[in-house]
């Protein structure tokens, strides 16, 4: 199935989804190591079998990752390599998603009920807005199809809604600073204790200075994952979730809490 799709001159959104599932064997949401090498091998074989030249994007991709064991790509990168239908590809090219800070602001806008999730209707509005910003419109049937596919692509725990970390896979890997925090998330009890410790004036939210102190301590304790030289960037991205400079417990929990007690 994946081979025949890779031979196509134009890949539909549904075919793209099938290709991704085929190669993301461990369901991590990223292609790395053997998964990435399998994709490259099958892509080369499929194009040769179909008598098709590699596109410039494919050639650049093969040159960049073909000889590397440490390569890692997400859905965004693959969407730029394969000849995907235009409107679906636009969802991965939006200016709003070029930086983590803009992504956080977009999240805040569409998580309208502040639940910490974007649910189906919110996701549909999000995608519709992205397409409109690119001066593209799709009918309701196509929009529903894209929404369904996005859920299938990004909803790693299959709960029918997207968490911040799931939605962040719309960002290119190098822009996704949330990946840095995946390995240092705290259980619910630890997170609440930390929040109360750094909310020094006890007003129920953390301001920029209090967040700065928290991040410095996290960097000191987790030097492998976090770089203290990037604190300004971390802070700017996280504060984009705040409400007028006030970072409430539920907002910070999206970044630092694993949710368990």
From Swiss-Prot:
Buffers cytosolic calcium. May stimulate a membrane Ca(2+)-ATPase and a 3',5'-cyclic nucleotide phosphodiesterase. It comes from Mus musculus. GO terms for molecular function: calcium ion binding involved in regulation of postsynaptic cytosolic calcium ion concentration; calcium ion binding involved in regulation of presynaptic cytosolic calcium ion concentration; vitamin D binding; zinc ion binding. Keywords: Acetylation, Calcium, Metal-binding, Repeat, Vitamin D. GO terms for cellular component: axon; calyx of Held; cuticular plate; cytoplasm; cytosol; dendrite; GABA-ergic synapse; glutamatergic synapse. It comes from the Eukaryota. Residues 2-7 are annotated as: Interaction with RANBP9. Ca(2+) 4 binds at residues 199, 201, 203, 205, 210. The keyword Ribosomal protein does not apply. This is Calbindin. Ca(2+) 2 binds at residues 111, 113, 115, 122. Belongs to the calbindin family. Expressed in the modiolar nerve root and in bushy neurons in the ventral cochlear nucleus (at protein level). The modification N-acetylalanine is found at residue 2. Ca(2+) 1 binds at residues 24, 26, 28, 30, 35. Pfam families: EF-hand_1, EF-hand_7.
């Amino acid at each position: 199935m994946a081979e025949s799709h890779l031979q196509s001159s134009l890949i539909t959104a549904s075919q793209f989804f099938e290709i991704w599932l085929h190669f993301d064997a461990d369901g991590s949401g990223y292609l790395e190591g053997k998964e990435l090498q399998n994709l490259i091998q099958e892509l080369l074989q499929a194009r040769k079998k179909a008598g098709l030249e590699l596109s410039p994007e494919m050639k650049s991709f093969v040159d960049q990752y073909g000889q590397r064991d440490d390569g890692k790509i997400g859905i965004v990168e693959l969407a730029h390599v394969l000849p995907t239908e235009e409107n679906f590809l636009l969802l991965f090219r939006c200016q709003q998603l070029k930086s983590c800070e803009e992504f956080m602001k977009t999240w805040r806008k569409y998580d309208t009920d502040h639940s910490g999730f974007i649910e189906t209707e919110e996701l549909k509005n999000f995608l519709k807005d992205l397409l409109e910003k690119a001066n593209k419109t799709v009918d309701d049937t196509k929009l529903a199809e894209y929404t369904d596919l996005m859920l299938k692509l990004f909803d790693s725990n299959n709960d029918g809604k997207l968490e911040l970390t799931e939605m962040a896979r719309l960002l290119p890997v190098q822009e996704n600073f949330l990946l840095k925090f995946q390995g240092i998330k705290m259980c619910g009890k630890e997170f609440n204790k930390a929040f109360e410790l750094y909310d020094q004036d006890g007003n129920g939210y953390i301001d920029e200075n209090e967040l700065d102190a928290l991040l410095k301590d996290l960097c000191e304790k987790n030097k492998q994952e976090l770089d203290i030289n990037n604190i300004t960037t971390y802070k700017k991205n996280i504060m984009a979730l705040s409400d007028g400079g006030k970072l409430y417990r539920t907002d910070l929990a999206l970044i630092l809490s694993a949710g368990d007690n």
